[in-house]
């Protein structure tokens, strides 16, 4: 070990002066040195070799002049050193030898300069240091041992002294400050230890710098981590002392320089390396005894690790992570939850203890944290949070919101919450305690978990979401308790969430628009907001929207302009008028207001476009929240009708599409037929069955086309764009159709999704469906819309079509127009382009015709594959030729086509609401079908790729639809590639329109004979890839169009299906084809209903691809206006058959089984344009036999915007399929028409009358699903569940067939319904069919009504229960209010009663006061009550002179006539008072009366006789000023008043005794005392007049009593009116004044002789 810590030269460690770490000892109060950070860096740069293993010391040395001190280091007396020198000493930093820094042995150490040692010794011995060191002697044994070694090293290195001002000195200082790494910690790989040096240096600098702070704390803290030996050796107080001195000594070396080095001394023992080594080892053994073994291992100078370095290292090693601290803190407060799995922390106060668990959620509460405190806690107790959530659905909201839309809105709210300041500080318990969080946190919610729940649609209301967000705050306040920033952030997140939830509840549509559009405020919600002029205090009236009224006094408004929201009093709101209600505004406000009004005008324009009209309200019309609906209707006429149209599009519009999820998970969009229009319209909402059947038809056609197309359709959803759906009244998934509007109780996308298996015929009301679908479309959050848009754009790019501007059909319609034009051009330009354009056209046609379309989603990969396969000349030659033909035809008929297209587009716009096609990648690949189709079509590779053809749904058909006129008449013998398109049943108008369109197209597009090589038997079905062609890819979505009505559904699958050609149905004589064409021509070209019927061409496995041109020519296109009869090349099934099929709205898919002729042309059943008058025209036209070679492209209905029609794959051989399908088609058509065509019936009836239709449907189904080809008459399949023919275990296809078998049931049910409806409503109506149809409708209605009644019952019961609860609550409230009111009234009455005096006898209000708590209403009551009251009367005073009762003495009441000024009036004593004399109070204004004759004239005062009361009790009665007493004296009493007393001006009371019986006379009259006892020292108030009374009762006047009653004999003397003493206080005052008035000298209280008089309240004593 190095001896860097060796003691000074003497080696006497006991006498060495202890030095604290990092500093020399000094008493000089120099300023604290500034340790610059540069010293840290400088050290590393300049002296990388210096190791911190040696402590560097500052050595105090005197300037060179004072270096002569050589006293022994052992001497500590201050005499050896000059005090002044100690003050001038400089502190030099001693550095270890650089070269030997890492060596633990002192062999290479140089000797310390003697002069330096002497200087150090002299400084140590200074008196100042001695005084300083006295308290720290215990540290000597350890702290002075490092200096000699350092001195030696420093001397050898030539760096004994170095100024701290130099950079090198700063480095050394930092080295000294730096703590050495503990020997127990292995050294880092770097030998220089620069890394940890720098850290320790920085730590040392921070710990050493503060001067004002108590260093004892820091050092004591470090000391606490020392080992036991260190703590024993070094007491804490010495450490504190050393720390105090540090800041002073550090600055001593500021002025020291290298020039001041003294000569070396060689007589130091420390120079002996052996001694230094032993000494150091000894000290280290004592200090670091427990680490000796570790020190032995370190040979790089780390052996002598300092105590403080050890302390710091220990601290760092034992530092706890925040997670551990949180775990320990939670463990301290944790208590078991009330129930396992519940929250152990109170939801309110976040404390543990005795908690009450909620029965609905995991929250727990203290009983005292729940309000009200009287809550009953039992097993069914629900916490306040759960109560709020349960009440959420009952709260009135402006608009309902679907779960999907709510999820989308909540995602916006979550994004806003994530941007709250400090939200990143909210840690999830999962992050902190990934393994043990469940113990403390039962619901660790984070933003990620919220996002996942939102995606999963877990929240049914905003209250649920807010309740979940509160868990974030709850967990954060528990996990980071005491962290103010976390608390603020959590509160801010909850606040933002609450605000967003309120906004969502206020108006979901506005909230969605606000987060998705910059122009959201001018858009019109489905339920428009009322426009107001609203005024906030301090602001002018401002235009605003009324978002809703929270109560009857405040309105929630949003102002135009900055879109601020506020609650405005109702009284400050006026309906929006054209005239500004502001009287005047400032210039700035006027400018801003003008801008806002412009925005309002834009909004009003939107309202007019959506609602149709807007009326300004009259000037200053008050807004009434209770009349909001009426006011809204007044301002926006027809607004509620528009809302109803949106909510129930099926009932309002002629065309409806039923979107149904079929058994194969395919979403089918089906037109509802007009059949049973009356019934179905009523049924529309209740009976989606027909539509479902149509949907099934779609799927069937799809099956004909390809299984893959079905799969694609499975995942498709039709969703209206959220933005437009909100604003567009027509954006409904259900396309409105007159006849089937009711039928369309189309299952909305929701329904389809919800009912995947399914075959519910009546899913939901059309209105509900539309709503749900609308919401779904919205809700399929923007992401789906974006996906659709992207997909559509990609698809459009792929197909060469313009990308649809929006997923909505309206936009798609525009796109379709463009696409159609493009398609037409493409078709004209190139056959290769034509397939794509044809597909577009087919979509357009479908849209125009408003026929049922199945939207099939094809995964993008599959789409690409399909396109590739299409590129491969798999497509039947028919498809390409039609394209070629189409160009020709287009050239010829472009003008017609353009006109027709325009008309069709207009129709589409009118009919089809915006539909957003939601694309979802189908799990099932279309590749199989594509592959199958491709092999089948491969022989036809010469032809356009199947997909292209199919995309064109025989592009030819689509192209013709796009440009029906251009094509020349389809060549009768040219085989048409038939794309199986299932048509929905069309209403008559629609059918006529479709027929006309088809006929036009047929005329315009001459069917080009495409010799189709006999397609491989069912493999062509695999043309399902071709379906890709027939199925138009919009984005990733493909739409298969199914027109059930068109029996001859043109299966352009020929294009898809490897050139499935229209093959005349075998059973149907082809000769009728001419008839068919005439019929077609006959059909009115313009059909009343815009729906064009698309001919269903059954595409059989395409035969060897015929020349594309031929196929194109064969494609028959019926223009809506063009009735050009398309005569199938050779044999067309009887037109009647086809028409009948169309009329029945059944989708008849003739199956071409490998007939060569059929192979050349897939059977196309052209549907003649329907006449508005009748469907017979349909019967006339039979598309089935239109030349078998005619490509099925014949009149493909335009797909819904962006929808592509998958061609129906032909089963087995085209011939067989044609034959089979032909017969069924004929039979079915005849059955539908109600007339059996001879040919068809003969062919189709053969075995089972049902077989033909069923066989056709089954064949289509099988083709659609891609199952093996059907037998001509699959009786087994029809008569069994199919398990024998296609056992589910046979393979995946068979399994799928089995699983989807119920689709056939649905399909046939719908077909039968349509058949019945057609038969009942046709020209030759069948009564039984009508009865059956009506019965069916009746059953549906009954079920629907039952359901409605049940709903009403349930709703009414709920309402009644709620009303009952409300009434009970109201009853309780009213009772409580009444009780409170009664209690208040009672208290008030009691108070009033207390304020009044009540008669002690009769309890009436008392006017006369007797004594305390005794008053009377009148004298009789006093007399009656006196016997009981006399004993306790406060007036009773023992008589001064008893008067015997035998002495009769008449009462003489001296009359007083004194002015109110208290002038005494002489009252003559009345000798003979008359009994009738009245007692009167003298009026104050009366002049004084002359003295009576009886009175001694010499006296100024009237003679008054004082009657001293005997011992009998007396009653004191307080008389009001207005009270007069009648005299009751029976005998005349004469008694001169002997001694009048000073008058009591305030006396208003009289003492009354019960009236004696007439026989009793007054007792002897005793003269009153002139000096009655003065009970109070007060003098009477002379200003108060004395009231005199004529008392009718014998009155005993007590001289001591304060009251006097004077009886005036017969004549009334004017009396001074005194104030009536009505109040007890007046009485008490009078009483005291009367007592005080007794004055022996009769002294006058006033200088005025009249004012001064003796007490006139002479007491008259009466005896009973």
From Swiss-Prot:
Domain of life: Eukaryota
Annotated knockout phenotype: RNAi-mediated knockdown impairs habituation learning.
Alphabetical UniProt keywords: Bromodomain, Chromatin regulator, Chromosome, Metal-binding, Neurogenesis, Nucleus, Transcription, Transcription regulation, Zinc, Zinc-finger
Bias-annotated ranges (Polar residues): 296-308, 676-690, 935-952, 1037-1053, 1620-1648
Gene3D superfamilies from the UniProt entry: 2.30.30.140, 6.10.140.2220, Bromodomain-like, Zinc/RING finger domain, C3HC4 (zinc finger)
Bias kind Basic residues: ranges: 775-784
SUPFAM superfamilies: Bromodomain, FYVE/PHD zinc finger, HIT/MYND zinc finger-like, Tudor/PWWP/MBT
Binding-site list for Zn(2+) 3: 507, 510, 525, 1399, 1402, 1417, 1421
Zinc finger motifs (MYND-type), residue ranges: 1399-1433
InterPro entries recorded: Bromodomain (IPR001487), Bromodomain-like_sf (IPR036427), MYND_ZMYND11_ZMYD8 (IPR057053), PRKCBP1_PHD (IPR044075), PWWP_dom (IPR000313), Zinc_finger_PHD-type_CS (IPR019786), ZMYND8_Bromo_dom (IPR037967), ZMYND8_CC (IPR056987)
Skewed-composition ranges (Low complexity): 1-16, 30-40, 61-84, 309-320, 953-962, 1073-1097
Predominant location category: nucleus
Domain Bromo: 401-504
Protein name: MYND-type zinc finger-containing chromatin reader Zmynd8
Species of provenance: Drosophila melanogaster (Fruit fly)
């Amino acid at each position: 070990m190095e001896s860097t810590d060796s003691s000074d030269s003497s080696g006497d460690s006991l006498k060495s002066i202890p030095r604290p770490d990092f500093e020399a000892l000094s008493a000089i109060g120099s300023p604290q040195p500034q340790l610059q950070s540069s010293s840290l860096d400088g050290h590393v740069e300049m002296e990388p070799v210096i190791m911190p293993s040696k402590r560097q010391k500052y050595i105090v040395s005197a300037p060179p002049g004072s270096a002569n001190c050589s006293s022994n280091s052992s001497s500590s007396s201050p005499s050896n050193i000059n005090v002044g020198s100690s003050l001038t000493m400089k502190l030099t930093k001693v550095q270890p030898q650089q070269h030997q820094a890492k060596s633990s042995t002192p062999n290479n150490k140089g000797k310390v300069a003697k002069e330096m040692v002497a200087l150090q010794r002299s400084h140590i011995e200074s008196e100042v240091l001695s005084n300083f060191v006295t308290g720290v002697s215990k540290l000597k044994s350890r702290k002075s041992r490092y200096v000699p070694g350092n001195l030696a090293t420093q001397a050898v290195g030539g760096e004994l002294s170095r100024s701290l001002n130099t950079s090198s000195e700063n480095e050394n200082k930092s080295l000294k400050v730096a703590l050495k790494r503990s020997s127990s910690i292995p050294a880092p790989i770097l030998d220089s230890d620069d890394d940890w040096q720098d850290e320790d240096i920085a730590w040392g600098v921070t710990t050493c710098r503060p001067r004002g702070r108590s260093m004892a704390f820091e050092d004591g803290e470090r000391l606490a981590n020392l080992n036991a030996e260190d703590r024993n050796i070094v007491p804490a107080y010495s450490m504190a002392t050393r720390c105090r001195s540090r800041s002073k000594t550090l600055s001593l070396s500021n002025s020291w320089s290298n020039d001041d080095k003294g000569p070396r001394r060689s007589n130091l023992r420390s120079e002996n390396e052996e001694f230094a080594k032993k000494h150091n080892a000894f000290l280290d053994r004592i200090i670091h005894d427990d680490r000796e073994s570790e020190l032995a291992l370190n040979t790089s100078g780390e052996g002598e690790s300092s105590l403080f370095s050890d302390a710091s290292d220990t601290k760092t090693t034992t530092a706890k992570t925040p997670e551990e601290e949180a775990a320990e803190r939670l463990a301290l407060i944790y208590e078991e939850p009330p129930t396992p799995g519940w929250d152990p922390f109170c939801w309110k106060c976040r404390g543990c203890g005795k908690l009450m668990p909620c029965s609905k959620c995991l929250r727990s509460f203290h009983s005292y944290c729940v309000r009200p405190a009287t809550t009953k806690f039992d097993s069914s107790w629900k916490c306040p949070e759960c109560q709020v959530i349960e009440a959420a659905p009952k709260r009135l909201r402006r608009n309902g919101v679907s779960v999907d839309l709510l999820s989308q809105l909540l995602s916006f709210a979550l994004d806003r919450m994530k941007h709250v300041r400090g939200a990143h500080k909210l840690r999830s318990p999962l992050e902190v305690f990934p393994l043990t969080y469940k113990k403390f946190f039962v619901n660790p919610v984070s933003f990620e978990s919220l996002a996942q729940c939102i995606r999963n649609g877990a929240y049914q209301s905003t209250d649920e979401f807010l309740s979940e967000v509160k868990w974030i705050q709850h967990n954060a306040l528990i996990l980071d308790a005491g962290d103010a920033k976390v608390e603020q952030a959590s509160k801010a997140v909850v606040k933002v969430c609450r605000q967003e939830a309120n906004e969502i509840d206020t108006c979901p549509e506005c909230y969605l628009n606000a987060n998705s559009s910059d122009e959201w405020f001018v858009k019109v919600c489905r339920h428009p907001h009322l426009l107001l002029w609203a005024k906030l205090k301090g602001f002018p009236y401002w235009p605003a929207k009324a978002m809703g009224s929270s109560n009857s006094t405040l309105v929630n408004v949003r102002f135009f302009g900055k879109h601020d929201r506020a609650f405005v009093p109702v009284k400050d709101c006026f309906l929006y008028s054209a005239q500004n209600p502001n009287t005047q505004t400032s210039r700035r406000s006027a400018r801003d207001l003008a801008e806002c009004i412009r925005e309002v005008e834009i909004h009003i324009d939107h309202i007019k476009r959506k609602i149709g009209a807007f009326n300004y309200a009259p000037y200053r019309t008050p807004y009434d929240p209770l009349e909001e609906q009426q006011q809204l209707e007044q301002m926006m006429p027809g607004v509620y009708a528009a809302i109803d149209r949106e909510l129930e599009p099926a009932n309002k519009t002629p065309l409806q599409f039923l979107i149904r999820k079929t058994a194969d998970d395919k979403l089918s969009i089906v037109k509802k037929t007009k059949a049973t229009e009356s019934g179905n319209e009523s049924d529309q909402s209740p009976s989606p069955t027909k539509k479902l059947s149509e949907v099934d038809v779609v799927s069937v056609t799809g099956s004909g086309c390809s299984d893959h197309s079905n799969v694609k359709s499975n995942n498709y959803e039709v969703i209206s764009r959220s933005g437009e759906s909100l604003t567009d009244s027509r954006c409904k998934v259900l396309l409105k159709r007159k006849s089937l509007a009711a039928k369309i109780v189309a299952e909305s996308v929701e329904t389809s999704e919800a009912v995947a298996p399914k075959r519910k015929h009546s899913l939901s009301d059309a209105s509900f469906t539309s709503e749900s679908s609308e919401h779904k479309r919205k809700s399929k959050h923007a992401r789906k819309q974006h996906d659709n848009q992207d997909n559509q754009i990609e698809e459009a790019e792929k197909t060469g079509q313009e990308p649809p501007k929006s997923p909505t059909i309206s936009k798609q319609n525009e796109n379709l127009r463009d696409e159609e034009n493009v398609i037409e051009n493409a078709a004209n330009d190139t056959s290769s382009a034509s397939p794509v354009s044809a597909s577009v056209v087919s979509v357009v046609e479908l849209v125009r015709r408003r026929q049922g379309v199945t939207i099939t989603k094809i995964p993008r990969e599959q789409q690409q594959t399909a396109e590739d396969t299409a590129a491969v000349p798999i497509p039947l030659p028919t498809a390409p030729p039609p394209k070629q033909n189409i160009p020709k035809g287009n050239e010829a008929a472009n003008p017609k086509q353009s006109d027709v297209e325009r008309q069709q587009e207009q129709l589409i716009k009118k009919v089809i609401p915006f539909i957003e096609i939601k694309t979802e990648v189908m799990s099932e690949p279309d590749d199989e079908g594509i592959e199958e189709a491709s092999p089948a079509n491969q022989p036809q590779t010469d032809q356009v790729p199947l997909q292209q053809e199919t995309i064109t749904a025989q592009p030819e058909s689509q192209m013709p639809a796009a440009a029906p006129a251009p094509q020349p008449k389809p060549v009768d013998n040219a085989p048409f590639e038939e794309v199986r398109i299932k048509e929905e049943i069309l209403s008559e108008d629609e059918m006529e329109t479709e027929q006309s369109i088809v006929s036009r197209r047929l005329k315009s597009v001459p069917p080009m004979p495409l010799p189709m090589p006999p397609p491989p038997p069912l493999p062509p079905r695999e043309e399902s890839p071709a379906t890709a062609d027939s199925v138009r890819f919009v984005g990733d979505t493909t739409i298969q169009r199914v027109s059930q009505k068109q029996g001859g559904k043109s299966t352009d699958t020929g294009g898809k299906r490897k050139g499935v050609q229209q093959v005349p149905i075998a059973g149907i004589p082809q000769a009728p084809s001419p008839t068919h064409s005439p019929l077609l021509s006959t059909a009115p070209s313009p059909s009343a209903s815009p729906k064009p019927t698309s001919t269903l061409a059954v595409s059989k496995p395409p035969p060897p691809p015929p020349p594309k041109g031929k196929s194109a020519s064969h494609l028959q296109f019926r223009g809506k206006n063009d009735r050009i009869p398309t005569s199938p090349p050779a044999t067309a099934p009887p037109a009647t058959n086809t028409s009948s099929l169309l009329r029945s709205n059944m989708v008849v898919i003739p199956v071409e089984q490998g007939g060569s002729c059929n192979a050349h042309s897939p059977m196309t059943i052209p549907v003649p344009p329907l006449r508005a008058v009748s469907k017979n025209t349909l019967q006339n036209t039979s598309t089935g036999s239109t030349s078998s070679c005619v490509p099925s492209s014949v009149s493909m209905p335009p797909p819904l915007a962006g929808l592509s029609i998958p061609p129906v794959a032909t089963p087995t051989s085209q011939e067989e399929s044609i034959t089979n399908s032909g017969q069924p088609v004929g039979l079915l058509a005849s059955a539908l028409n109600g007339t059996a065509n001879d040919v068809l019936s003969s062919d189709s009836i053969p075995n089972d009358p049902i077989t033909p239709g069923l066989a056709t449907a089954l064949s289509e189904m099988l083709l659609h699903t891609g199952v093996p080809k059907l037998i001509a008459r699959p009786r087994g399949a029809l008569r069994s569940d199919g398990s024998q023919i296609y056992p589910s275990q046979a393979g995946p296809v068979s399994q799928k067939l089995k699983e989807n078998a119920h689709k056939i049931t649905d399909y046939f049910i719908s077909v039968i319904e349509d058949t019945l409806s057609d038969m009942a409503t046709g020209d030759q109506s069948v009564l039984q069919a009508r009865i059956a149809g009506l019965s069916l409708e009746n059953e549906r209605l009954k079920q629907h009504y039952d359901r409605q009644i049940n709903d009403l019952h349930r709703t009414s019961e709920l309402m009644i229960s709620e009303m009952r609860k409300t009434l009970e609550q109201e009853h309780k409230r009213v009772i409580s209010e009444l009780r409170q009111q009664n209690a208040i009234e009672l208290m008030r009455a009691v108070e009033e009663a207390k304020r009044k005096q009540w008669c002690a006898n009769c309890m009436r209000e008392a006017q006369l006061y007797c004594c305390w708590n005794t008053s009377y209403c009148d004298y009789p009551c006093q007399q009656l009550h006196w016997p009981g009251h006399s004993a306790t009367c406060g007036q009773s005073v023992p008589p001064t002179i008893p008067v015997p009762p035998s002495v009769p003495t008449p009462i003489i009441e001296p009359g007083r006539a004194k002015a109110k000024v208290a002038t005494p009036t002489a009252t003559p004593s009345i000798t003979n008072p008359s009994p009738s004399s009245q007692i009167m109070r003298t009026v104050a204004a009366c002049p004084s009366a002359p003295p009576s004759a009886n009175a001694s004239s010499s006296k100024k005062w009237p003679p008054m006789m004082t009657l001293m009361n005997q011992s009998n009790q007396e009653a004191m009665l307080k008389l009001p000023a207005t009270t007069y007493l009648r005299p009751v004296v029976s005998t005349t009493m004469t008694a001169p008043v002997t001694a009048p007393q000073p008058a009591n001006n305030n006396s208003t009371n009289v003492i009354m005794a019960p009236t004696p019986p007439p026989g009793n006379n007054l007792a002897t009259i005793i003269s009153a005392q002139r000096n009655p006892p003065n009970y109070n020292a007060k003098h009477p108030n002379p200003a108060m007049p004395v009231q005199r009374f004529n008392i009718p009762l014998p009155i005993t006047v007590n001289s001591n009593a304060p009251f006097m009653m004077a009886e005036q004999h017969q004549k009334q003397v004017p009396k001074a009116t005194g104030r009536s003493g009505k109040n007890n206080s007046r009485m008490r005052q009078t009483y005291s004044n009367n007592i005080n008035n007794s004055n022996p000298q009769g002294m006058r209280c006033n200088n005025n002789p009249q004012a001064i008089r003796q007490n006139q309240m002479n007491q008259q004593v009466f005896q009973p």
